[in-house]
Curated annotation (Swiss-Prot):
GO molecular function: beta-N-acetylhexosaminidase activity
Identification of the protein by name: Beta-hexosaminidase
Organism: Pectobacterium carotovorum subsp. carotovorum (strain PC1)
Catalytic activity line of the entry: Hydrolysis of terminal non-reducing N-acetyl-D-hexosamine residues in N-acetyl-beta-D-hexosaminides
Active-site residues (renumbered): 176 (proton donor/acceptor), 248 (nucleophile)
Record keywords: Cell cycle, Cell division, Cell shape, Cell wall biogenesis/degradation, Cytoplasm, Glycosidase, Hydrolase, Peptidoglycan synthesis
Any one biological process term the GO annotation gives: cell wall organization
Primary localization: cytoplasm
Length: 342
């Protein structure tokens, strides 16, 4: 298994997709809305991906809830992370967050999808890229809700990915469109944004982490996703994290400062990433596969899902029915809240 995660073109694999998936550097596939028509088609696409690859790949998606939910029709309408604490008492917020983590993960596992890149652990809502994807502006509240969400994901059989280390919440720029810079003192980032990552690592609740394509100017001129300081010195050595480190998508503008696609891939792997995402740019992905030295990434097998239930079994279960009802209701309440309704 190799360290490259990439995407496929449409609802089913074409000849080029199949050729790419056989490459020994490929270790994963990430799915997008363009890959989804309905649940039966999605399940068949995942089957095709499994059949086309030499080894079992890590199949992933961003199914956070709120505005980041790639699969909608036939799946529960998941609330944005902010909704849990914003609209409920603390005990109810924690209960619903646990059910939200379980439901999201269980619905994906029933499609034979290994991981959804969640939860978002960024603090605060002012960032254009993050906004309602953050659990809360208070680090302690965000930690409590995140722990419940993680407990739910783990109980379904899915590994969790905390993002975007060391924290994307304080920058207004969107790293999909530009390279954001965070000029705050390191002490502030450590005391505020990093607190949640540190606590969850100490409690061994994070299986993987995705760093931010953000330059923290007081620490390193490189984005955190390509920074040995953040990934090796801080995350591995200081915090003792021994899980998987993903790069965020190397096609994002936030990664462009690291050079060409092969240069970005090399920089992120050398900085300490275990798996690199190259999405929505097939030419860039192929150039990485053509130019990257052979790398094995067998540790990625830790990310395979542990569920063994079918979609029918899930939808017939009492827990799914109750969770679906509660989370759909919370999504509707959150939308009404954003629209200014009582």
């Amino acid at each position: 298994m190799g360290p490259v995660m990439l995407d496929v073109a449409s609802y089913e694999l074409d000849a080029e997709d199949r050729e790419v998936l056989e490459h020994p550097l490929v270790g994963g596939v990430i799915l997008f809305t363009r890959n989804f028509h309905d649940a039966a088609q999605l399940r068949e696409l995942v089957r095709q991906i499994r059949a086309a690859s030499r080894e079992r790949l890590v199949v992933s998606v961003d199914q956070e809830g709120g505005r980041v939910q790639r699969f909608r029709d036939g799946f529960t309408r998941l609330p944005a992370a902010q909704a849990f604490a914003a609209l409920n008492s603390e005990p109810e917020a924690l209960r619903l967050a646990e059910e939200g983590g379980w439901l999201m993960a269980a619905e994906m596992i029933s499609m034979d999808i290994d991981i959804s890149f969640a939860p978002v652990l960024d603090i605060g809502h002012q960032s254009a890229a993050i906004g309602e994807r953050s659990f809360h502006a208070n680090p302690e509240t965000a930690l409590a809700v995140a722990q419940s969400f993680i407990r739910g994901m783990h109980s379904a059989g899915m590994k969790v990915t905390g993002k975007h280390f060391p924290g994307h919440g304080a920058v207004s720029a969107d790293s999909h469109k530009e390279t954001p810079r965070d000029p705050r003192p390191l002490a502030e980032i450590r005391a505020h944004d990093m607190l949640i990552f540190k606590a969850l690592i100490q409690r061994q609740q994070l299986d993987a982490i995705m760093p931010a394509h953000v330059i923290y100017t007081e620490a390193d001129p490189r984005p955190a996703s390509g920074s040995p300081y953040w990934l090796k010195t801080v995350l591995r050595e200081e915090l003792g994290f021994d899980g998987i480190i993903f790069s965020d998508d190397l096609s994002m503008e936030g990664a462009a400062v690291m050079g060409s696609y092969p240069e970005r891939a090399q920089a992120t792997l050398q900085a300490g990433c275990d798996m690199i995402l190259v999405c929505n740019h097939r030419e860039g992905a192929v150039s990485v596969l053509d130019n990257l030295s052979p790398v094995k990434a067998e540790q990625l097998t830790r990310l395979y899902h542990q569920g063994s239930f079918s979609r029918r079994e899930l939808l017939d279960s009492p827990r799914w029915k109750l969770a679906n009802q509660a989370l759909t209701s919370l999504s509707e309440r959150w939308q009404a809240h954003k629209n200014g309704e009582k």
